């Protein structure tokens, strides 16, 4: 992103915050294409549905698209003819994908430049380890043990597209770009709402950009009201969210909110409140009573219904008591567990025992959901019995083995933070036996005969990588003991959720 931003630093259009001229410059499409490939290489599973965009990209297509945008009448085509009437061998949907990627990348670059300028003069420590998904778990272990209740909320969508356009007004100052953006949405798609899952046929980068804009908008309102209703000042809001005319926009909302709910801001005061957003959801943790959690619950329901015009049912907001309920958080089932301890204290000639109870956050592996993901991808049946992967039998033996080993290591890597690894060993067993059955099916042999012919060395690949990592972390004597079975390890290099973890 820093390299791409350099192309925009000395551009006259950027000095005036005009984005519309960038749609007619070829080098911007090259930057967008390179940015897309970088994200594709980091997380290929998200962008597999749009592989045609990367295969068909060329400078000649960009020139044709620019010429077509100069003649906007040629862009206006009925929705039913979106995949028909190909222009120079390409459908209109393909050209819309190019425009959507370009718009998302341009606004993202501009927002990163603006965000970088807000950090100037502020002494902020940058830690790349905080980018890891696992970095949030040590924080929760330290904080959630003091809390009683957690509000688990699924961020609602779809949302009306016109509200998204209005939201982008506070990031994009150029009216021409906003008009062009609205034109593309309504002329090409003719949608009323944004639904990422149903519109997955189009570009995911573009829809993730729209979705993140929607989340950023509601979070800015939430943080603003939280700051007004709390005695503690929040410094992160000022640094992380730069809003243009935000206070002018929020003034009307606050007036309506306070008039309709006169006691809400006072009742929502709670200095011990933690908010964590993740994967289309967020949790709100507090040590207060269920009454306060219900007030926050109906506050969010009214916020989305009144301000964002999204019909949101209160049943989608779950209030979990950590001592009794499991919290489904980033692929783990987390709950508070009482760990009794007996401490012997001796003072002079007298000794006595002290019973102490330590509250500990227990993160368990959701074996049922992972088996459901494995069954969905044809690694096993719904009961967890391994089956052969028929679609991989045309590949080479080394390719099949390496792919199974990589999947097994990724799952083991992600769930290393659980103390009870019995479920993890069961998942690894399913993958190993599935690998053997796949290879045996390819060679038209039985599993017993195949293992007898190749020996046990075939499965050593599943253990080599994990053993090397753990041997570097722990002493050899400790690594060889059974105590390693209950050791929790949080890795700080996990940036994305695995598809098997992301099962719904």
From Swiss-Prot:
Keyword NADP attached: no
Keyword Chloroplast annotated = yes
Q: What is its main location?
A: plastid
Q: Which GO terms describe its molecular function?
A: RNA binding
Disulfide bond positions: none
Which keywords describe this protein according to UniProt? Chloroplast, mRNA processing, Plastid, RNA-binding, tRNA processing
Cross-referenced Pfam families: Intron_maturas2 (PF01348), MatK_N (PF01824)
Write out the function statement from the record. Answer: Usually encoded in the trnK tRNA gene intron. Probably assists in splicing its own and other chloroplast group II introns.
| Record protein name field | Maturase K
Q: Gene name on record?
A: matK
């Amino acid at each position: 992103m820093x390299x791409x931003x350099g192309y925009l630093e000395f551009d006259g259009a950027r000095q005036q915050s005009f984005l519309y001229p960038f749609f007619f410059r070829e080098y911007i499409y090259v930057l967008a294409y390179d940015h897309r490939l970088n994200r594709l290489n980091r997380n290929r599973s998200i962008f597999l549905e749009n592989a045609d965009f990367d295969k068909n990209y060329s400078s000649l297509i960009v020139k044709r698209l620019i010429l077509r945008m100069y003649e906007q009448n040629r862009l206006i085509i009925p929705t039913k003819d979106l995949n028909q009437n190909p222009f120079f061998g390409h459908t209109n949907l393909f050209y819309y994908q190019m425009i959507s990627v370009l718009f998302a990348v341009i606004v993202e670059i501009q927002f990163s430049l603006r965000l970088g300028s807000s950090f100037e003069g502020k002494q902020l420590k940058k830690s790349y380890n905080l980018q890891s998904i696992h970095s949030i778990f040590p924080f929760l272990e330290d904080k959630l043990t003091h809390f009683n209740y957690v509000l688990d909320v699924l961020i609602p969508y779809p949302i009306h597209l016109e509200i998204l356009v209005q939201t982008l007004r506070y990031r994009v100052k150029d009216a021409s770009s906003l008009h062009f953006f609205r034109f593309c949405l309504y002329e090409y798609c003719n949608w009323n709402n944004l639904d990422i899952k149903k519109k997955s046929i189009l570009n995911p980068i573009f829809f993730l950009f729209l979705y993140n804009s929607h989340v950023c908008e509601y979070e800015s309102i939430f943080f603003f009201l939280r700051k007004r209703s709390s005695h503690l000042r929040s410094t992160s809001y000022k640094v992380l969210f730069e809003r243009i005319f935000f206070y002018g926009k929020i003034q009307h909302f606050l007036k309506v909110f306070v008039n309709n709910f006169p006691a809400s801001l006072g009742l929502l005061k709670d200095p011990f409140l933690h908010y964590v957003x993740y994967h289309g959801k967020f949790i709100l943790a507090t040590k207060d009573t269920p009454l306060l959690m219900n007030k926050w619950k109906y506050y969010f329901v009214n916020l989305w219904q009144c301000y964002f015009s999204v019909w949101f049912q209160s049943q989608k907001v779950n209030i979990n008591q950590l001592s009794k309920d499991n919290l489904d958080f980033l692929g783990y089932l987390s709950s508070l567990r009482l760990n009794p301890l007996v401490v012997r204290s001796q003072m002079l000639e007298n000794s006595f025992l002290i019973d102490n109870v330590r509250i500990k956050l227990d993160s368990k592996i959701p074996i049922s959901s992972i088996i459901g993901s494995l069954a969905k991808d044809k690694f096993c049946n719904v009961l967890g019995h391994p089956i052969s992967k028929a679609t991989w039998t045309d590949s080479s033996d080394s390719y099949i083995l390496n792919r199974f080993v990589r999947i097994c290591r990724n799952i083991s890597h992600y769930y290393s933070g659980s103390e009870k690894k019995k479920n993890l060993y069961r998942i690894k067993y399913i993958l190993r036996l599935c690998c053997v059955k796949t290879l045996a099916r390819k060679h038209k042999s039985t599993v017993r005969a195949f293992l007898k012919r190749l020996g046990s060395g075939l499965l050593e690949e599943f253990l080599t990588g994990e053993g090397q990592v753990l041997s570097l972390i722990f002493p050899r004597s400790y690594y060889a003991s059974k105590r390693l079975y209950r050791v929790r390890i949080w890795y700080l290099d996990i940036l994305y959720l695995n598809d098997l973890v992301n099962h719904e």
